[in-house]
Amino acid sequence: MEARLAELESRLAFQEITIEELNLTVTAHEMEMAKLRDHLRLLTEKLKASQPSNIASQAEETPPPHY
């Protein structure tokens, strides 16, 4: 009985350590993903700003011939 209890306590301690390590990993990944989202947003904005659209606005469009 005593050996079983010691084994369970050992497993619990190992699981607690593993959970803490996984938590740290998940937190680090979340921070990295936030940085990557910010970089992607900035790059998207820069790309849109550097490449003007070839589609004219409705004000610039000439009306179709049937008008």
UniProtKB/Swiss-Prot annotation:
Region Disordered, residue ranges: 47-67
Pfam annotation, one family: SlyX
Matching InterPro entries: SlyX
Composition-biased stretches (Polar residues): 50-60
Gene3D superfamilies registered for this protein in UniProt: 1.20.5.300
NCBIfam families documented for this protein: PRK02793.1
Protein family per UniProt: Belongs to the SlyX family.
PANTHER family referenced in this protein's UniProt entry, alphabetically: PROTEIN SLYX (PTHR36508:SF1)
Name of the featured protein: Protein SlyX
The encoding gene: slyX
